[in-house]
Amino acid sequence: METLTAISRWLAKQHVVTWCVQQEGELWCANAFYLFDVQKVAFYILTEEKTRHAQMRGPQAAVAGTVNGQPKTVALIRGVQFKGEIRRLEGEESDLARKAYNRRFPVARMLSAPVWEIRPDEIKFTDNTLGFGKKMIWLRGSGTEQA
């Protein structure tokens, strides 16, 4: 199975991303509901400007994070680790992402928080259901996939 396809299928079944930013050596992580766009290979989240993590990252910053389930046995562990960039969307780009986000999470229509895009450069998918420690790696722009 193609790596990005496997990753995207699994991410479509999840809904919370943990992402971390740093500023001047200080790290901070946050959780958010996400929409994953398989075409752009990007997560879309809503978060207020006044939050600690938004203040630390500014309009654009390096980011790392995870998405994981909560299995009760090691044999069922599946999860994603990623690194990339986060940026606040503006204008039409923000409007389009918000419409898609609201379709997945209708309650978000009541929120005015800005839309942010997490654009991973690298994604590592661990899937123990395919064998203990099975990992698949996707790298943006490399044209290569590692399994």
From Swiss-Prot:
Domain of life: Bacteria
InterPro entries noted in UniProt: Split_barrel_FMN-bd, UPF0306
Family: Belongs to the UPF0306 family.
Protein name in the entry: UPF0306 protein YhbP
Species name: Escherichia coli O157:H7 (strain EC4115 / EHEC)
